[in-house]
């Protein structure tokens, strides 16, 4: 039986040893990176043999996934026809993906075990500076977003302050995670640059180097981001 402690790269990430200097240094480095840029990437967090298992388990469930096809603005809000037609809040983005909800996952699936591993949530709480709790929603607590040929996630902001994502498989091409860091401020939105990006400008766009097995901590509430169209199955 697979134990959660055997899922991650423990030589590099001894998350179950919080009293060690290695753990404390790792947490501090991740915290510093996240505070500076809104991004922290734990490279090679899960190694290939476990990724292969995660892919197999996901493939066995994808036929039951929820298909999502949406035309939305960056905030996922209803259209406001009191605004000019070319206002960024009225500009639409297309998103197409399949999502596997938490309640369809087997309790012994590697992703499920990792999500419920206490040392992981303790470490992430230390990095983010506040206590994290697992979501009680039986469907949305943990989801797997799957994209095939032509699917993508259009420009948007997240509803949550922070998103934690593990990439388990690379597409043949495309599928780039792109962002404009801190485009949105606590009290203001830069509609001028937002409008330019939605019209096709790549000024300020950063492509994150996220590989299969990497764990990404991302402040998606303030940073505009997207996943470019996928090529391959």
State where each predicted segment sits:
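Signature of the catalytic double-stranded beta-helix
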Residues: 46-47, 53-63, 84-138
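Short beta-strand His + acidic residue motifs that chelate non-heme Fe in jelly-roll/DSBH
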Residues: 153, 224-231
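A short, aromatic/hydrophobic, helix- or strand-capping loop or linear motif
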Residues: 65-74, 136-139
